[in-house]
From Swiss-Prot:
GO terms for molecular function: GTP binding; GTPase activity; translation elongation factor activity. Residues 176-178 are annotated as: G5. It catalyses: GTP + H2O = GDP + phosphate + H(+). The lineage of its organism: Bacteria, Bacillati, Actinomycetota, Actinomycetes, Pseudonocardiales. CDD domains: EF_Tu, EFTU_II, EFTU_III. Monomer. GO terms for cellular component: cytosol. NCBIfam families: EF-Tu (TIGR00485), PRK00049.1 (NF000766), PRK12735.1 (NF009372), PRK12736.1 (NF009373), small_GTP (TIGR00231). Residues 83-86 are annotated as: G3. It is an enzyme of class 3 (hydrolase). Residues 19-26 are annotated as: G1. Its EC number is 3.6.5.3. The gene is tuf. This is Elongation factor Tu.
Length: 397
């Protein structure tokens, strides 16, 4: 068999397993690495169940999350796969964006069918904008009755459709992660069938460099004789010397200017791109006019807003969060990209209060406008201490 080698030009896709506790997310993740290791050993190391299950903890926006990262390759693509073992870890990951997903494999045990967390995970996936979900109907070896499996499949499809995913069309693949992990060839083939479905159906993500330019401003200083420089890490897109840009946020109106120089590590460049830490020299703008918390963008692509709806996770006391609940008109700081802005919280109708450890929807009114799009993530802070994390789901004004 010809050796497949790691090609830089293979598309890179972020994927994850979601679903109810004990339905087999982690076993499936391990089984995928085993089956691919057996098929293309030079491309894929095998990652045993224990390694994924004992995922290291990591911090995202001040929140500790246990999450496992494994990598593997099919013939078509290179995948980074995340598996959050605990339900709370999954919720926190989705809201903080510790690991972004271009697509998700919803794991449902054929023996149980959809359970409460199955629904909650799908709802969250929609709210945080996971573009595509397909289904692994796991433990299929344990159900002999074809009618029962068909019924479970129908329930899962209805659940996906209810959350505006194309439930009628998504692939539902019957697998036994445990049997595949134990080396059963027939069930191993079903894992390959699942991966083929992932290859074929999860869309190629838009590359960060293809998106419109945006750089959050971290610092501003003036260089005598040259003008004002703003520094930061380019979040998306590319910037070329002599391109027009706007500075958006904090102020009522955007400031228009031209980038006359791009500098990285004290060297002048023609272009800066997503991921680069750069200094941008800007024409005709005084240092006092610009501040941290504004963003530099391609003109007309991003607007400043003060009112939005969000899905948030509030840290539990054990995680270093609040010890007490909060109520309507709670006024914390909202930390967007590089700066804190105070905002007033309105809770959904019927929600009296929010307890530490809860996730909830809320409306927020900021005292200063911030450049935002739906999907923007933020931390909720009190006196510099993180007490929650959230994601903008809808912008009002």
């Amino acid at each position: 068999m010809a050796k497949a080698k790691f090609e830089r030009d293979k598309p890179h896709v972020n994927i994850g397993t979601i679903g109810h506790v004990d339905h087999g997310k982690t076993t499936l993740t391990a089984a995928i690495t085993k089956v691919l290791h057996d098929k293309h050993p030079e491309l894929n190391p095998f990652t045993p169940f224990d390694e994924i299950d004992k995922a290291p903890e990591e911090k995202q926006r001040g929140i500790t999350i246990q999450i496992a990262h494994v990598e593997y390759q099919t013939e078509k693509r290179h995948y980074a796969h995340v598996d959050a073992p605990g339900h709370a870890d999954y919720v926190k990951n989705m809201i903080t964006g510790a690991a972004q997903m271009d697509g998700a494999i919803l794991v449902v045990a054929a023996t149980d069918g959809p359970m409460p967390q199955t629904r909650e995970h799908v709802l969250l996936a929609r709210q945080v904008g996971v573009p595509y979900i397909l289904v692994a109907l796991n433990k299929a070896d344990m159900v002999d009755d074809e009618e029962i499996i068909e019924l479970v499949e129908m329930e899962v499809r209805e659940l996906l459709s209810a959350q505006e995913f194309p439930g009628d069309d998504v692939p539902v693949v019957r697998v036994s992660a445990l049997k595949a992990l134990e080396g059963d060839a027939e069930w191993g083939d079903k894992i390959m069938e699942l991966l083929d479905a992932v290859d074929e159906n999860v869309p190629d993500p838009e590359r960060e460099t293809d998106k419109p330019f945006l750089m959050p401003i971290e610092d501003v200083f003036s260089i005598t004789g040259r003008g004002t420089v703003v520094t930061g890490r380019i979040e998306r897109g590319v910037i070329n010397v002599n391109e027009e840009v706007e500075m958006v946020g904090i102020k009522e109106k955007p400031l228009k200017t031209t980038v006359t120089g791009v500098e990285m590590f004290r060297k002048l460049l023609d272009q800066g791109q997503a991921g680069d830490n750069v200094g941008l020299l800007i024409r005709g703008i005084k240092r006092e006019e610009v501040e941290r918390g504004m963003v530099v963008v391609k003109p007309g692509t991003t607007t400043p807003h003060t009112e939005f709806e969000a899905q948030v996770y509030i840290l539990s006391k054990d995680e270093g969060g609040r010890h007490t609940p909060f109520f309507n008109n709670y006024r914390p700081q909202f930390y967007f990209r590089t700066t804190d802005v105070t905002g007033v919280v309105t809770l959904p109708e019927g929600t009296e209060m929010v307890m530490p450890g809860d996730n909830t929807e809320m409306s927020v009114q900021l005292i200063q406008p911030i450049a935002m799009d739906e999907g923007l993530r933020f931390a909720i802070r009190e006196g510099g201490r993180t007490v929650g994390a959230g994601r903008v789901t809808k912008i009002h004004k």
